[in-house]
Amino acid sequence: MTSREGRAPLARRAVVYGVVGLAAIAGVAMWSGAGWHRATGASGESPEASVAGGSVTAPPQAAVPASTGLPPSLAGSSAPRLPLDAGGHLAKSRAVRDFFDYCLTAQSDLSAAGLDAFVMREIAAQLDGTVAQAEALDVWHRYRAYLDALAKLRDAGAADKSDLGALQLALDQRASIAYRTLGDWSQPFFGAEQWRQRYDLARLKIAQDPTLTDAQKAERLAALEQQMPADERAAQQHIDQQRAAIDQIAQLQKSGATPDAMRAQLTQTLGPEAAARVAQMQQDDASWQSRYADYAAQRTQIESAGLSPQDRDAQIAALRQRVFTRPGEAVRAASLDRGAGSAR
């Protein structure tokens, strides 16, 4: 196993999950490929959190157990809840996209027809016999049409971030495709993300305008920030806090600070609770690295045993389930296995 295999940068994960909390950093997301595929295992709401933002989640008892018939990449996970409005219809919410993105995580394991069948089963597990079931299937077909159209763009609609004209074109193309394929679902699926992307692009245009002085740039950036809705401004503050914390943690790691020294310094700037979470993540990270290294060694033995592809994959999947028993761990290991396989 390489030094990078089995891990994401601790500094970034500590901030995103342990220090500041999740924030929607969408400014870079649009330039990637056809879709965001959600890490699973802890993504669903608890049954108690059944009412949010005027919608209700589908009844918890309708869900299929996570271990039943899931593709290998989703083993040990469960689908996010599909939200319903007060009338029992599918609520127009970003949570619906999250559900489909969860299902799309399995696309490397399934054919196109197999993926459609899997999504139909997951929808039925929550909405069988309801009016929302047909609505969810219709939205799925719309979302697939969006992703298919996006994939036909040059480089799947990705753009060189140094070319502001290309960025603007990519953004406009994606927005047009979303509206054409998703209709009134384009706003709940991508509205907030597209607003953030346009805001970030406007900032880039100001920052890179050679006709402006530094003072003029600062003035225009401040004026642009004032146009932000209050919730977006709060999100931007979270992003700024994240970046500062990431830089601090990375610098402490680079300097070789001991866990106690890192915790002491982070306590001063982030507070004792956040510092304690970072320390716990360090311990969890070390434990994960050790277990993944042991697992990777056993996986290599299986791969070298001359088994048929079917038997090999079955044994590796069984090994993952034995070694990684916490929610989401087997999914993470499977994802890392695919990355390691493509690198070999």
Swiss-Prot record:
Disordered: annotated span: 39-78
GO CC annotation terms, alphabetical: plasma membrane
Entry-linked SUPFAM superfamilies: Lipase chaperone-like
InterPro entries: Lipase_chaperone (IPR004961)
Pfam family of the protein (one): Lipase_chap
A GO BP entry: lipid catabolic process
Annotated GO MF terms: unfolded protein binding
Membrane-spanning intervals of the chain: 14-34
Localization (cell): Cell inner membrane
Membrane topology: Single-pass membrane protein
Leader peptide range in chain numbering: none
Disulfide bonds: none
Record's keyword annotation contains Glycoprotein: no
Key words, A-Z: Cell inner membrane, Cell membrane, Chaperone, Lipid degradation, Lipid metabolism, Membrane, Transmembrane, Transmembrane helix
Function according to Swiss-Prot or TrEMBL: May be involved in the folding of the extracellular lipase during its passage through the periplasm.
UniProt similarity note: Belongs to the lipase chaperone family.
Stored HAMAP family: Lipase_chap
Protein name, entry field: Lipase chaperone
Organism: Pseudomonas sp. (strain KWI-56)
Protein encoded by which gene: lifO
